[in-house]
Design a protein with these regions (language model features):
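Bacterial N-terminal signal peptides
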Residues: 10-19
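Extracellular/lumen-exposed scaffold segments
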Residues: 23-167
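Short, Lys/Arg-enriched N-terminal segments with co-localized hydrophobic residues
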Residues: 1-2
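Short hydrophobic helices that act as membrane-entry/anchoring signals
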Residues: 5-8
């Protein structure tokens, strides 16, 4: 029938477009940078770009609540972690009716950092990141990624003069 053909021709591609949009909305993108602090101390900064209209949860933790953002740094040879992961961005805090608790969220961008001490001229640190994003209606399934951050000692520092082997 004509109505069926119209439905098949117009509505199915539109429905497929909405399904594709929902599937790609999860695309939080992550980038890393390295800042020299002093001597052999550096700060690895991770930045998330969060697509509108979604928000991403802060590092919590939230028992019985949303999946908080979790970042685990694994240092390679010639580098050690100094302290824990810090949130550089300030989350917006509000009471969430769904989870019945106060939670912190980021919209647009979120920045996190880990301080490290370099004992070799070059080293790598892996960052395993897990997060979840939601809008006002629903949440996407939790997602994860892993970044590898390359560190190179600044000239004139003890690490730059090190002959320690890095694998």
């Amino acid at each position: 029938t004509t109505m069926y053909k119209l439905f098949r021709t117009l509505l199915l591609p539109v429905a497929a477009l909405f399904a594709f949009t929902a599937a790609t909305a999860q695309n939080v993108s992550w980038k890393s940078s390295v800042e020299h602090r002093e001597g052999d101390v550096y700060r690895i900064v991770l930045e998330a770009s969060i697509p509108a209209p979604y928000h991403m949860y802060d590092m919590g933790p939230y028992e019985g609540g949303p999946n908080a953002t979790a970042i685990v740094f694994t240092p390679g040879d010639g580098v050690t972690l100094e302290g824990g992961v810090e949130q550089l961005s300030t989350p917006e805090r509000h009471y969430d009716k769904t989870f019945e608790m106060e939670i912190g969220t980021f919209a647009g961008k979120a920045r996190f950092a880990q301080q490290v001490k370099l004992a070799a001229a070059k080293a790598t640190v892996k960052a395993a990141i897990e997060w979840m994003i939601c809008d006002e209606v629903s949440c996407m399934p939790p997602d994860d990624t892993e970044l590898t951050v390359e560190l190179t000692a600044r000239p004139g520092t003890a690490a730059a003069n090190s002959t320690a082997a890095v694998s």
